[in-house]
Amino acid sequence: IGEGGAVVGNDEELMDRVWSYHNCGRQFGTMKKPGNNPIVGNNRRMTEYQAAIGLSQIKRIESDTQKRGENAAYLTSRIKDIPGIVPHKLYEGVTRAAYHLYPFRYKKEQFNNVPKEKFMAALRAEGIPCSGGYGPQYRDGLIEDFLTSKNFTRSFPKARLDQYRKELNYPANDQLCQEAVCFTQNLLLGPKQDIDDIANAIEKLYQNRDKLA
């Protein structure tokens, strides 16, 4: 793991594309494609400092994972009966999760059709950081790059590629992305009172949904 060397040039667009490639394919500078990750890229960076921190954190991985799991279960128990809030659930047979994110679905119809963005802003105003999670990544531009690449255009007729584009539709995935609200893993490492604060804030927003509309 790691990166080294340098790339220099006088073509701004090319240099921006090089930067994007080394940083997960994310947009930068003159990159004007839709989505957060318009091209295929990588991320191989690691410093000695990061390695030292990582090694020390390994000692806590079991206890932190246990703590996040317990707090996630408690949070679910607190918010599962709030109308319009649908906590995530683990598949049958799954004994624990890492909880990189704790997601739940926000059904705006139960909140007087208050948009998700407004709900999240109100939640942040209560001191609870949150985000909308990931968008529909199949629309970020990576697939289109593959479809227009030399390998694909040589291997498949245009009609087949156009058909694939037409069939590229995942409404259930899109709905999940539209409804998702997420907490980052660090929120699950605090004491029980922190989890109560999160649940109480969501309950407060529901009770005052008329004022949010």
Predicted feature locations:
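Glycine-rich phosphate-binding loop of ATP-grasp-fold ATP-dependent ligases
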Residues: 2-7
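PLP-dependent aminotransferase class I/II
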Residues: 10-213
